[in-house]
């Protein structure tokens, strides 16, 4: 059986994972909680967790907000799929990403069932833009990320995503293996 099923909270606009102002209303929070409760209650999983992947423009957008979501949902089969890279949306979180990782794992580590592993690069331009890049193309300390995840699960699933070619995936896998001495 699967360790977890990963989804996003969803958006209040045309695109299911899109960025919209209405993603951040109290009504959207209530709909998100109700949706998660309904999915878990109807599926009644015994061995698998239902998880929400954090996104930069929909609930939850911080570790504290994710804890609040866990509390509001109140289901033991609700957990976390961690994509910390989607939360690196400010200069502080970017430049102090190791401290941010520590905060995230301290607060959510016991709930995390799987992780995305990738890298982030701040474009050197006057309009701030973060670009998701292959592992090794940004500034993230991947060893620290893997070490923090392993504290909670030595066999934590780590998933690479959003690359443009098989070659990029293979390069990222080799880079991660070298960095993590696998």
Would you name each region that the model predicts?
Residues 1-80:
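Active-site acidic/histidine proton-transfer and metal-coordination neighborhood
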Residues 37, 63-182:
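Histidine-acidic metal/acid-base catalytic patches
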């Amino acid at each position: 059986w699967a360790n977890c099923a990963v989804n996003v909270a969803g958006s209040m606009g045309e695109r299911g994972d899109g960025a919209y102002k209405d993603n951040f209303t109290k009504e959207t929070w209530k709909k998100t909680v109700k949706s998660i409760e309904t999915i878990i209650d109807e599926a009644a999983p015994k061995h698998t967790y239902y998880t929400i992947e954090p996104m930069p423009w929909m609930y939850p957008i911080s570790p504290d907000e994710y804890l609040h979501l866990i509390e509001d949902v109140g289901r033991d089969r609700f957990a976390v799929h961690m994509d910390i890279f989607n939360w690196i949306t400010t200069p502080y979180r970017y430049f102090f990403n190791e401290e941010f990782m520590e905060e995230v794992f301290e607060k959510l580590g016991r709930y995390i069932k799987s992780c995305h592993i990738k890298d982030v690069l701040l474009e050197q331009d006057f309009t701030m833009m973060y670009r998701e890049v292959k592992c090794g193309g940004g500034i993230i300390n991947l060893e620290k990320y893997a070490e923090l995840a392993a504290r909670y699960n030595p066999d934590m699933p780590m998933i690479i995503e959003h690359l443009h070619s098989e070659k990029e995936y293979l390069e990222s896998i080799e880079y991660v293996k070298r960095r993590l001495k696998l």
